[in-house]
């Protein structure tokens, strides 16, 4: 079975790199699912994106991503984000509080974090 090489990088750290069978996220033009051998593209991620990486025989990775870009090439998928957090790193109560902020950037980040922990769609 063909695999998808994935690299997710935030400004402050490398988040994850490895192989996947499918990747799902939201861009400014809509939701996108990427399988191996997807056509090349570059897209801007929404400010409250959640990236789901499906891996063969392992639990899906759910990562809250605050803005950034997605690039798909023949070599795989690269996501360059302003910030990113694994589901396991997220404090759900703090994320809920952030999602209710009057500051749109903080609220977007809170929503992304809530999506990553499965608290909202």
UniProtKB/Swiss-Prot annotation:
It is found in: Cell membrane. It holds the Pfam family ATP-synt_DE_N. It is a peripheral membrane protein. InterPro entries: ATP_synth_F1_dsu/esu (IPR001469), ATP_synth_F1_dsu/esu_N (IPR020546), ATPsynth_dsu/esu_N (IPR036771). It comes from the Bacteria. Its main location: membrane. One of its GO terms (cellular component) is peptidoglycan-based cell wall. SUPFAM superfamilies: Epsilon subunit of F1F0-ATP synthase N-terminal domain. Keywords: ATP synthesis, Cell membrane, CF(1), Hydrogen ion transport, Ion transport, Membrane, Transport. GO terms for molecular function: ATP binding; proton-transporting ATP synthase activity, rotational mechanism. GO terms for biological process: proton motive force-driven ATP synthesis. F-type ATPases have 2 components, CF(1) - the catalytic core - and CF(0) - the membrane proton channel. CF(1) has five subunits: alpha(3), beta(3), gamma(1), delta(1), epsilon(1). CF(0) has three main subunits: a, b and c. Was identified as a high-confidence drug target. Belongs to the ATPase epsilon chain family. Produces ATP from ADP in the presence of a proton gradient across the membrane. This is ATP synthase epsilon chain. It comes from Mycobacterium tuberculosis (strain ATCC 25618 / H37Rv). The lineage of its organism: Bacteria, Bacillati, Actinomycetota, Actinomycetes, Mycobacteriales. The gene is atpC.
């Amino acid at each position: 079975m063909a695999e998808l090489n994935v690299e997710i990088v935030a400004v402050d750290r490398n988040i994850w790199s490895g192989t996947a069978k499918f990747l799902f996220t939201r861009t400014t033009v809509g939701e996108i699912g990427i399988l191996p051998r997807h056509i090349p593209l570059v897209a801007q991620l929404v400010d409250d994106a959640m990236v789901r990486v499906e891996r063969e025989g392992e639990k899906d990775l759910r990562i809250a991503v605050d803005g950034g870009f997605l690039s798909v090439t023949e070599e795989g998928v690269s996501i360059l984000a302003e910030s990113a957090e694994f589901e396991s790193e997220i404090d759900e109560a703090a994320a809920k509080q952030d999602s209710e902020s009057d500051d749109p950037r903080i609220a977007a980040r809170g929503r992304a974090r809530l999506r990553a922990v499965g608290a909202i769609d």
